[in-house]
Amino acid sequence: MLKLQGEDEAAQLAPRRARVPVPRPTAPDVSPSSARLGLACLLLLLLLTLPARVDTSWWYIGALGARVICDNIPGLVSRQRQLCQRYPDIMRSVGEGAREWIRECQHQFRHHRWNCTTLDRDHTVFGRAMLRSSREAAFVYAISSAGVVHAITRACSQGELSVCSCDPYTRGRHHDQRGDFDWGGCSDNIHYGVRFAKAFVDAKEKRLKDARALMNLHNNRCGRTAVRRFLKLECKCHGVSGSCTLRTCWRALSDFRRTGDYLRRRYDGAVQVTATQDGANFTAARQGYRHATRTDLVYFDNSPDYCVLDKAAGSLGTAGRVCSKTSKGTDGCEIMCCGRGYDTTRVTRVTQCECKFHWCCAVRCKECRNTVDVHTCKAPKKAEWLDQT
């Protein structure tokens, strides 16, 4: 190896540096309690950095009206946003379906402590109530999925969507208990409604892939199959004097109320489950409990009693709710008010009565005034309320 001229001189002229011993770092004396505290802090940091389950979802589309702007819908995952941008007409139907299933949910639970109340201008629609894996969450996921199927299927058959129309599979000759008939008319395209609802509604759960996602996917499927369950056969007779020698039939959606009633019964018989270790299926929550079938709604957590305002549990309480003084059911004051008692207010209601038809062409009614007692649940005591918030 060649050395540059003067390199040796420079080496000789350079002062020799004394070697200073460097102390080796020693491990700090850490007590077991400090170690546990550090581990807890690390776990907390990991939990904060992991994506949390937030039920801001496509449900908010129902609050946007006819003008659905995909980028302004909070909570959509990328697949849902892609479908929204590609099919804006279908998104309007999804919004109509959202409004319909929320109305149906509120009808089904109008006499219960939890009455499917929505929160204005809240992207989660129900607040924190759906974060708990409860019966109520099971019902909401099922009926929301059913609402999308029903709305899209109806829009297809009514010619409101360019991507679908009548059911293309109902063609040719068929038979039922009354005999042979020809498929005709415009059968509701349930196949397209189910297919799009599955792709759109299930997209978020398929992305998360946790136990709650498995529960939601199961209940979503229950909702879709419920709509298909109540397809009805409508027919028109052809023949001399309506003899019905030839029938033309088509499949039609039933009123959404039938789906709501059915899912309400499924709610009453919902099965409490736990996820299996591999996270691919369910097992009964306790030994001796029956196993869930494909038509059962499933849930993990017991519901709160919904008696008092509890923001953490998503409970709005029953203070001020109207109740029946004489009923022994869930709408009765004893159950609705959770034993807190009720207030009675006398109110006068004005209704139309003694209506008569006058030629031509008007209906004239009188105004009738009725004084009735309205019973409303008392608010809990202040100390009790503070304990729950």
Swiss-Prot record:
Task: Tell me which UniProt keywords the record has, alphabetically.
Answer: Developmental protein, Disulfide bond, Extracellular matrix, Glycoprotein, Lipoprotein, Secreted, Signal, Wnt signaling pathway
- What post-translational events are described? Palmitoleoylation is required for efficient binding to frizzled receptors. Depalmitoleoylation leads to Wnt signaling pathway inhibition.
Chain segments carrying region Disordered: 1-33
* GO-annotated molecular function: signaling receptor binding
Query: Which CDD domains did the record assign?
Result: Wnt_Wnt2b
Q: Which Gene3D superfamilies match?
A: 3.30.2460.20
Lipid moiety-binding region (O-palmitoleoyl serine): 241
What this chain does, per the entry, is described as: Ligand for members of the frizzled family of seven transmembrane receptors. Functions in the canonical Wnt/beta-catenin signaling pathway. Plays a redundant role in embryonic lung development.
Record text on subunit structure and interactions: Forms a soluble 1:1 complex with AFM; this prevents oligomerization and is required for prolonged biological activity. The complex with AFM may represent the physiological form in body fluids. Interacts with FZD4 and FZD5.
Q: Which family does it belong to?
A: Belongs to the Wnt family.
Q: What is this protein called?
A: Protein Wnt-2b
Species? Mus musculus (Mouse)
